Every structure is written in C-alpha cells, then in structure tokens.
Design a protein with these regions (language model features):
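Pocket-forming structural segment of enzyme catalytic cores
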Residues: 83-85, 96-195
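Flexible gly/pro-rich beta->alpha loop and the following alpha-helix that scaffold active-site loops
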Residues: 20-86, 98
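Alpha-helical elements of Rossmann-like donor-binding domains used by nucleotide-donor carbohydrate transfer enzymes
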Residues: 18, 72-75, 160, 199-203
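Glycine-rich nucleotide phosphate-binding loop and flanking beta-alpha elements
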Residues: 11, 60-62, 91, 152-153, ...
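Cofactor-binding loop segments of dinucleotide-utilizing enzymes, especially the Rossmann-like FAD-
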Residues: 5-7, 37, 89
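Short, charged N-terminal beta->alpha structural module
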Residues: 2-27
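Short beta-strand segments
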Residues: 4-6, 34, 146-147, 184
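Acyltransferase
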Residues: 8-11, 183-207
Length: 207
C-alpha cells in the first residue's frame, strides 16, 4: 500500500490527485491511501503500514500553515522506516522539517504572497548531479514539469543536492543515510513526450 499525504489546505490544489493518478497508471492494481496532513501521526502511519510515503505539494505559502498541524508529518519525515518522496512543496516540507529555509525564488513585481513572485512553470530542463537511486537510468539532463514560486534556499543538515537548474538551484535532494528524497518538480506529470518523471516514480517504488 502507498500513502499520499495531502498537504493542501481545504483541498485546494490538484497535487494529491495527480500523484495518485500517476501511480495508478504505473500500477493499475496498486492500493493507495490519501490522508490529510493534519491527521498524520506516527501511530496512524504505523497502523496503515505503507510501503512508500509521498508528500504532495502545498496550496498556500508554508507560513500560513499551523505548525502544530505539521508536527505529525515532520515526525514521519524524521523517523519513518519507509522510503519518503516529497514532491514540489513536499520537498520544501522536508527542508522545513530539518530546519532549512524556504522562500520565494524571487519577487519580480508588487503584491503579497505569490502575487508578483517569479514562478517556474511548464516542462523545464533539470541537470542531474547523480544518476543513481531515483534517477537511475536517466540522462544527465531531464525534462520535467515545474510549477512553483517557493524553493528550498539552503540544504538541510545530512542532505546532498542531486539536481539543479538555472531558475531554482536545489531541484532535488536526498538524505545521506535514510531513504528520504525531495524533488522540486512534478514527476507525476509525465507523458509520452516527457517520460522522465515516470522513470523517477518507478525507481522510487523499487526502493
């Protein structure tokens, strides 16, 4: 069974549904459970017993989230024995759990929140700094879907950077001793012309 942790507020945002859809395309018979982030606790995850855990993107800037409601997910990020993959805002959530900073890529106009912020969006090139692990079997430069205004500003302790591009420096990272991975892009939004995201998900599911 696969667990998707839904990081959206009030169900705004399509990331959890898109991750589920991609996983069902890869394995039509797979069992998937989606749980709201505020309902996550170590005990609940232990009862569910997933083989892999996915952290979805978020729908609002992280400062609008109640820290107490994120505590359960942070505990899972730090201690879960299962492989964990944070997608887009899920990578940022991993960074926050380990004390790193998340902020806008750049502000290019007036406004508050995401208004006036630089957004990386569309199929973009990302340069891999490793072709092992979840990036096994891929070329040194991949094409994946991006849609974000925030980014991880500094690597958390015990993490290494595994991908980059010119717009947003930390495009992927992984823990040095635990199976915890983050990608700033959306591997679930793959198609026949852009298959690299599918390979990433397939590699993760083999861990």
């Amino acid at each position: 069974m696969l667990l998707i942790i839904d990081n959206t507020i009030e169900g705004v945002g399509s990331s959890p549904r898109e991750i589920r859809s991609a996983l069902e395309r890869i394995d039509p018979g797979v069992r998937i459970v989606t749980e709201r982030f505020e309902n996550i606790s170590p005990e609940h995850v232990k009862v569910l017993g997933p083989s892999h855990i996915f952290l979805s993107g978020q729908s609002h800037p992280w400062h609008r989230y109640n820290p107490s409601e994120l505590a359960g997910v942070f505990h899972v990020i730090h201690h879960a024995p299962q492989p964990v993959l944070g997608v887009c805002g899920g990578q940022q959530q991993i960074a926050l759990a380990y004390g790193a900073r998340v902020d806008l890529i750049e502000r290019i106009g007036p406004g508050e929140g995401y208004e006036g912020a630089l957004r990386e969006r569309g199929y973009c090139s990302v340069d891999l700094q490793t072709t092992n692990g979840i990036f096994g079997g891929l070329p040194e430069t991949i094409t994946v879907w991006e849609s974000h205004c925030d980014e991880v500003k500094n690597l958390p302790p015990d993490f290494v950077q595994t991908a980059t591009n010119e717009t947003s420096h930390i495009q992927a990272m992984q823990h040095t001793s635990r199976p915890v991975f983050g990608v700033q892009f959306h591997p679930e939004l793959f198609d026949e012309e852009h298959p690299h995201g599918r390979t990433i998900l397939e590699n993760f599911l083999k861990l």
